[in-house]
């Protein structure tokens, strides 16, 4: 039992380290882009500090999203939780709301297309049977 818990803890730590490395890499790439665009330099310590702050903020976001869903007596985080998280940044909230509405519209269109295809399929399956009846009457 104790070995399983230790192994699980090691896996969790390893996973967290990989996530941190991915965040660090992404922050480094973004800093490089900004450095080229603005003709400035970022030290390795600055990139590391931005990476650590970003990772901690993401942890806080994850905890907040879990709490929002739990408060609503849900086990799944939804777009309303994300909007609630972004409420302090008007531009981010607007962007998320616009994207959410865009996705909802796309989903509605896909549903309508599926429904139309299924209706067309059922009409096509009826037509040959009806045609057969007409032919046999002549």
Curated annotation (Swiss-Prot):
Keywords, comma-separated and alphabetical: Acetylation, Cell cycle, Cell division, Centromere, Chromosome, DNA damage, DNA repair, DNA-binding, Kinetochore, Mitosis, Nucleus
One GO cellular component term: inner kinetochore
Location of the protein in the cell: Nucleus; Chromosome, Centromere; Chromosome, Centromere, Kinetochore
Signal sequence residues: none
Tissue expression remark: Ubiquitously expressed.
Main location: nucleus
GO molecular function list: chromatin binding; DNA binding; protein heterodimerization activity
Keyword Secreted carried by entry: no
Residues found modified as N-acetylmethionine: 1
Region of interest (Disordered), residue spans: 110-138
Entry keyword DNA damage: yes
GO biological process, one term: DNA repair
Subunit structure: Heterodimer with CENPX, sometimes called MHF; this interaction stabilizes both partners. MHF heterodimers can assemble to form tetrameric structures. MHF also coassemble with CENPT-CENPW heterodimers at centromeres to form the tetrameric CENP-T-W-S-X complex. Forms a discrete complex with FANCM and CENPX, called FANCM-MHF; this interaction, probably mediated by direct binding between CENPS and FANCM, leads to synergistic activation of double-stranded DNA binding and strongly stimulates FANCM-mediated DNA remodeling.
Similarity comment text for this entry: Belongs to the TAF9 family. CENP-S/MHF1 subfamily.
Function: DNA-binding component of the Fanconi anemia (FA) core complex. Required for the normal activation of the FA pathway, leading to monoubiquitination of the FANCI-FANCD2 complex in response to DNA damage, cellular resistance to DNA cross-linking drugs, and prevention of chromosomal breakage. In complex with CENPX (MHF heterodimer), crucial cofactor for FANCM in both binding and ATP-dependent remodeling of DNA. Stabilizes FANCM. In complex with CENPX and FANCM (but not other FANC proteins), rapidly recruited to blocked forks and promotes gene conversion at blocked replication forks.
Name of protein: Centromere protein S
Organism listed in the record: Homo sapiens
């Amino acid at each position: 039992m104790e070995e399983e818990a230790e192994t699980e803890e090691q896996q969790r730590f390893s996973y967290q380290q990989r996530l941190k490395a991915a965040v660090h890499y992404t922050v480094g790439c973004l800093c490089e882009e900004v450095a080229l665009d603005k003709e400035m330099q970022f030290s390795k310590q600055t990139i590391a500090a931005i990476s650590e702050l970003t990772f901690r903020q993401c942890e806080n976001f994850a905890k907040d999203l879990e709490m929002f869903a739990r408060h609503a007596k849900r086990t799944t985080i939804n777009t309303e939780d994300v909007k609630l998280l972004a409420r302090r940044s008007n531009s981010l909230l607007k962007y998320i709301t616009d994207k959410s509405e865009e996705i909802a519209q796309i989903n509605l269109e896909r549903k309508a297309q599926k429904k139309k295809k299924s209706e067309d399929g059922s009409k096509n399956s009826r037509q040959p049977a009806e045609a057969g009846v007409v032919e046999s009457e002549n």
